Amino acid sequence: MAGVRQHGWRAIPAVCSEYGADTLPDRYRSDGRCLLFRQQAGISALKQELEVKTPYRAMNHPVIGVVTKADLASMEQISLVKSWLREAGAHNVLVTSAVNNNGVTELFALLHTEEGCC
């Protein structure tokens, strides 16, 4: 439909170990290793935006990394995941815990700024 943006996302499960992160399609691990979910946003843009000739246009947008459930992880685990997010291209990395309400206000503030918006 012309002039309408459609937004969607999908969660991609992965297992983290000392060797890295492995993607696990359609299954979860129960061996005690840390589970990661990388959420991937998909956007169908206006026809005019799709006609832009810049290669890999969508890949040039800023990325925000968010570490969730920080109350369940050690500082070492949080530090490791933060470094992975930075290596993956996240310009801003936030640590949040909904249980303790840590980092949630900062996340919403960042999402409502021009520079933090993806």
Curated annotation (Swiss-Prot):
One of its GO terms (biological process) is biogenic amine metabolic process. One of its GO terms (molecular function) is ATP binding. It holds the Pfam family PduV-EutP. This is Uncharacterized protein YoeF. InterPro entries: EutP_PduV, P-loop_NTPase.
